[in-house]
Regions:
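Short coil-to-beta-strand
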Residues: 1-9
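Basic/polar, cationic surfaces and motifs that engage anionic cell-wall
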Residues: 21-141
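A generic structural motif
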Residues: 13-19
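Conserved beta-strand segments that form the floor/walls of ligand-binding pockets within enzyme
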Residues: 9-11, 47
Length: 141
């Protein structure tokens, strides 16, 4: 699918190894507010390159403030309430339901962990990752 013709891409300048400057994030929040209002963009549709193309993209980096964006209405985040996945919880299906391309499960897991766990060191889901994934999955149902 040609995502570029039906999306708006925003590039932020960052070397990939440090947090984004506050002024840059403040400007981004202002721009996103305008775009959301003008185009009626749903909250869940604010995503990163790696979320839509996990096999080809690895940005934004782990320092990107996804939680802060979510607090302003841009993108989904999870709450801190305990949630234990059901015994029949299927992590790969959950990744697919929340929007990840799971044809390459390792890439999908890596992108999920970069976005929601700020982790790129491991490529498997641990119990904490599965709990977060379960919380997000429940929001999509």
């Amino acid at each position: 699918t040609d995502v570029n013709s039906v999306s708006i891409g925003i590039e932020l300048d960052n070397n990939g190894h440090e947090p984004f400057p506050d002024a840059q994030i403040t400007s981004l929040l202002q721009l996103l507010a305008r775009l959301k209002k003008d185009y009626g963009i749903p909250t869940a549709n604010f995503i990163g390159h790696a979320d839509i193309a996990p096999t080809r993209k690895n940005d934004p980096n782990v320092f990107f403030p996804w939680k802060k964006l979510s607090e302003h209405g841009f993108g989904l985040w999870y709450d801190n309430l305990p949630a234990i996945p059901d015994s029949n919880f299927n992590s790969i299906l959950a990744l697919r339901i929340i929007g990840y391309d799971v044809r390459d499960t390792t890439a999908a897991i890596r992108s999920f962990k970069r976005h929601f766990m700020q982790d790129t060191a491991t490529r498997v889901l641990n119990d904490a990752d599965r709990q977060v994934l379960y919380k997000l999955y429940q929001k999509y149902l």
